[in-house]
């Protein structure tokens, strides 16, 4: 891997605001991923989520559930720990775009009707972290320093 690209991906000058955003958003994503993958927190697991995904046109449903669950669970954990925040945020933003247009958009804007407002907020938070990086209080800063890059 190109060291310059790696260091640029990890570089961040963001302060505590990035920490204040990425930790709760990461917890939210990880919890939703755990629902999809493991059936934790009242989720349906891969079988139920896969059937639902298939019913809304995301085929093959099981594979799409596995991908969405993995992105949300592991991407969420990456945000919490501040590890590879930009790639995690990019994957999470993409997952939210799919959720918005494949599941929620036809239900309108408001969450009480199954709309896309919550997914849009998570998309916006992910894009913000994609731009800012994990911030000074992230594992990315330590990785960048170790590889010879700076903030």
Where in this protein do the model-derived segments appear?
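Extended, low-polarity transmembrane helix blocks
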Residues: 1-40, 62-70, 74, 81-151
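Membrane-interface interhelical connector segments
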Residues: 39-60
């Amino acid at each position: 891997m190109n060291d310059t690209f790696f260091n640029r991906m990890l570089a961040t000058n963001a302060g505590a605001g990035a920490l204040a955003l990425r930790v709760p958003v990461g917890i939210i994503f990880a919890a939703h991923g755990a629902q999809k993958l493991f059936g934790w927190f009242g989720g349906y697991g891969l079988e139920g989520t896969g059937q639902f995904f298939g019913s809304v046109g995301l085929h093959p449903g099981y594979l799409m559930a596995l991908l969405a669950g993995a992105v949300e669970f592991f991407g969420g954990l990456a945000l919490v720990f501040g590890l590879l925040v930009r790639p995690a945020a990019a994957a999470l933003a993409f997952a939210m775009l799919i959720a918005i247009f494949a599941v929620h958009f036809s239900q309108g804007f408001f969450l009480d009707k199954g709309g896309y407002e919550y997914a849009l907020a998570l998309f916006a938070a992910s894009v913000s972290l994609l731009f800012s990086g994990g911030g000074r209080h992230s594992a990315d800063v330590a990785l960048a320093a170790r590889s010879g890059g700076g903030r």
